[in-house]
């Protein structure tokens, strides 16, 4: 499963195509609903079985994941778009209110979590953004040489976050 922000979709597809990686693009038939917030896990756990953090599980034709990060705990729900409204109605009938992407951005900004395409780009690495914990331990990956050099030399820019006391 590969989920990217809509603004990065073409870039990701180009990368996959250039590297001859086979994939099935389900963008037009699949929806993603992120259920996040203070009581999200407690509320959604009343009618679905929640996976462990950083894992996924499939029930019928719905995939549940706890792989996102926004500053609040939650679960991402991937389902066929013909089933989306029924699922949204189920959420609402269980006390979970809908909100937009602006809410997600507010949560992640309050938690100082960068978003690829905005605070993270081709020019800003995870090391520079203070996200070294997200880097794989595999022997080889795209950008490994740059990452290794930044970790070793410590001579790189640092993305800094500020908390305003207002």
Enumerate the predicted regions with their spans:
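Conserved, structured C-terminal
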Residues: 1-166
């Amino acid at each position: 499963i590969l989920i990217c922000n809509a603004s990065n979709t073409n870039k990701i597809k180009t990368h996959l195509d250039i590297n001859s990686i086979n994939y099935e693009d389900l963008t037009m038939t699949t929806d993603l609903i992120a259920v996040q917030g203070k009581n999200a896990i407690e509320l959604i756990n009343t009618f679905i079985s929640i996976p462990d953090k950083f894992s996924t599980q499939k029930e019928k034709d719905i995939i549940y994941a706890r792989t996102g990060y926004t500053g609040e705990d939650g679960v991402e729900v991937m389902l066929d778009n013909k089933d989306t409204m029924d699922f949204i109605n189920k959420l609402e009938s269980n006390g979970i209110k809908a909100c937009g992407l602006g809410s997600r951005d507010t949560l992640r900004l309050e938690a100082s979590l960068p978003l690829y395409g905005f605070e993270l780009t081709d020019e800003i690495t995870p090391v520079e953004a203070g996200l070294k914990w997200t880097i794989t331990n595999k022997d080889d990956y795209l950008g490994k040489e740059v990452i290794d050099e930044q970790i070793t030399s410590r001579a790189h820019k640092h993305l800094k976050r500020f908390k305003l006391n207002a």
